[in-house]
Amino acid sequence: MASRKLRDQIVIATKFTTDYKGYDVGKGKSANFCGNHKRSLHVSVRDSLRKLQTDWIDILYVHWWDYMSSIEEVMDSLHILVQQGKVLYLGVSDTPAWVVSAANYYATSHGKTPFSIYQGKWNVLNRDFERDIIPMARHFGMALAPWDVMGGGRFQSKKAVEERKKKGEGLRTFFGTSEQTDMEVKISEALLKVAEEHGTESVTAIAIAYVRSKAKHVFPLVGGRKIEHLKQNIEALSIKLTPEQIKYLESIVPFDVGFPTNFIGDDPAVTKKPSFLTEMSAKISFED
């Protein structure tokens, strides 16, 4: 990047929080290089700028919430980096919605930089993200960068799985078995059915299109080791799922949004349907 002088054409996002020095200083000796505290942030950004050979980071994420640093310390420290021009935008990952909400309210009420993007686990099989994270992001105007959108590569059609086995390639896994679970098989079959309705066999493209159809400003984190993977990722950009297709995919694995949403309902500005409690008072309609 530096040698080709492409910095201004590239958006760089990186994170801090996870220990990145344990291998160097020794196990159990890297408390200064882990966590959300100011010291961890300082050394992490210092070293990231050096390694990336750049003067600034476009998006800096809090990687995960450690529950040991105060919201005030974290947001104050991050804002200093923005003021210094070392960071342009702030993101947060794998953190409870209540923490992000409190952090953004603190930042905006004190003239500091709030989080503008949230990164977390979300796919058609695991929809916990939809309980609090999406409504929170909608409220604050935050973008969403879901990871694990393709189920860690485990959303595969039966044909694709058999082809991988013939080549001696199993499904990638960090925990558990390399075989698909029953739920992964079912959702993969459903994704393939929808894919065929769009004239493709790409389960991956439909999995990506699903999250992009569910909310605004969704930028899925995608990967791949082959050119064909990249092509499937790009193919998703031209696919728009219908409400019926979304409903079908969501019928495969039941999802309970939980209390209080399953009691009072979702935001009528989104659903266009008022709470039954509201309708007890009068007939109210919500329009676009």
UniProtKB/Swiss-Prot annotation:
<protein>
    <recommendedName>
        <fullName>Putative aryl-alcohol dehydrogenase AAD10</fullName>
        <ecNumber>1.1.1.-</ecNumber>
    </recommendedName>
</protein>
<dbReference type="InterPro" id="IPR050523">
    <property type="entry name" value="AKR_Detox_Biosynth"/>
</dbReference>
<comment type="similarity">
    <text>Belongs to the aldo/keto reductase family. Aldo/keto reductase 2 subfamily.</text>
</comment>
<dbReference type="GO" id="GO:0006081">
    <property type="term" value="P:aldehyde metabolic process"/>
</dbReference>
<dbReference type="InterPro" id="IPR023210">
    <property type="entry name" value="NADP_OxRdtase_dom"/>
</dbReference>
<dbReference type="GO" id="GO:0047681">
    <property type="term" value="F:aryl-alcohol dehydrogenase (NADP+) activity"/>
</dbReference>
<keyword id="KW-0560">Oxidoreductase</keyword>
<dbReference type="InterPro" id="IPR036812">
    <property type="entry name" value="NADP_OxRdtase_dom_sf"/>
</dbReference>
<dbReference type="Pfam" id="PF00248">
    <property type="entry name" value="Aldo_ket_red"/>
</dbReference>
